[in-house]
């Protein structure tokens, strides 16, 4: 079995993402592509993602809200057929369950702490 790696497509530019995908295709690894809200909401971002039928895709959206809203957010991207999608676990177990219930084949990944937060920042917000 091939190892998997995800490449972050942290841009709003479709042309940059096309280059990233072109330059990272390899037979040695299963390569997937991570997209955040900035790309999904960019001009033509959603349209581009909808055409990535043969790619492994990861929607790193960190949805964080009440259960009904998290579920609705997951439903709203269901047509894009992401393999993975993130929900912030601070939304609570019921929100995670609600998202999972409507996710179909998309696997839900719980995000606990943002990587940009160091110990000082975590203490400032009460962790």
Regions found by a protein language model. Give the residues of each.
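Intrinsic structural disorder
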Residues: 1, 24-28, 85
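Conserved anion-binding
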Residues: 2-3, 65, 69-127
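Hydrophobic faces of well-ordered beta-strands that scaffold small-molecule active sites
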Residues: 4-9, 31-35, 57-61, 85-87, ...
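Conserved alpha/beta-domain cores
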Residues: 9-47, 67-70
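Extended aliphatic helical segments
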Residues: 14-17, 31, 49, 56, ...
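Acidic (Asp/Glu)-rich catalytic clusters
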Residues: 21-28, 46-54, 76-79, 98-104
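Short hydrophobic interaction/assembly module
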Residues: 47-71
